[in-house]
A protein has these predicted regions:
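N-terminal topogenic module of multi-pass integral membrane proteins
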Residues: 31-89, 93
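Structural signature of hydrophobic alpha-helical transmembrane segments
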Residues: 70-82, 129-141, 164, 191-195
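Alpha-helical membrane segments in multi-pass integral membrane proteins
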Residues: 137-148, 158-179, 186-207
Length: 226
């Protein structure tokens, strides 16, 4: 039976180490120990999570920028790709022992589901609609969370720094807009910032896909020297 389990990174691929112990009773106790290495060859879930976040963010912020009204397309993306896909990616990252990615993808997946719930619950009269100050507090809390997560990206790559940095700005701009009752022009400008944020996540996700497929850097991520 395995008595210990740990993961190590080997060229970006975790290796699962299972330690087996066998005991023999003679005049005393002797222990034989062997280690079996199992290389993790499962696919990288990060591109799925980044694309789910990025595409949904672009579509929502096209609404914020004034291109169309909020509609079922945005809500469906929030439930399925922005919500469910990110949660799946986060669970897969948990299996790989990636605390940062697990926290990010599961949290933002649940953010999208909670945002849809805020809209739908009010429409169904299952609760009072959130006023602007409540929404400002909601968005500011997510902005604070994202700002702290941004610090973590300083050890990762430039592409993720852009994603989390622009997302932090987006959350606080949205919070300010709701708290102050900002003009339509301010909210439209915030929408354009959100479109940029979404496309930066799409870039980061597709870069990982193409770089792996071609076995070389097709789209640079700007790796940080540790």
């Amino acid at each position: 039976m395995p008595s210990a389990c740990s993961q190590f990174a080997d060229l970006g691929q975790p290796i699962l180490l299972l330690r087996y112990r066998s005991f023999f009773r003679q005049t005393g106790h002797a222990m034989n120990e062997s280690i079996t290495q199992i290389k993790d060859i499962t696919a990288k879930p990060a591109p799925l999570g980044l694309l789910g976040f990025g595409m949904t963010t672009v579509l929502l912020n096209l609404h914020n920028a004034g291109f169309y009204e909020l509609n079922s397309m945005v809500l469906a993306m929030g439930i399925c790709y922005g919500g469910a896909a990110q949660i799946v990616a986060g669970i897969m990252e948990w299996r790989k022992g990636n605390t940062f990615a697990t926290t990010a993808f599961v949290s933002y997946g649940l953010f999208w589901l909670s945002l849809v719930a805020l809209i739908v619950l009010a429409k169904l009269d299952w609760g009072a609609a959130s006023d602007e100050k409540a929404m400002a507090a909601y968005l500011a809390m997510w902005g604070l969370f994202t700002a702290v997560m941004f610090i973590g990206t300083l050890r990762l790559n430039r592409a993720l720094q852009v994603v989390f940095g622009s997302l932090t700005i987006l959350f606080f701009l949205l919070a300010i807009g709701d708290f102050t009752g900002a003009s339509a022009g301010f909210k439209h400008a915030t929408g354009y910032e959100g479109i940029f944020c979404g496309f930066s996540a799409i870039y980061a996700g597709l870069a990982q896909v193409l770089n792996e497929v071609f076995g070389k850097i097709v789209l640079p991520l700007g790796l940080v020297k540790k």
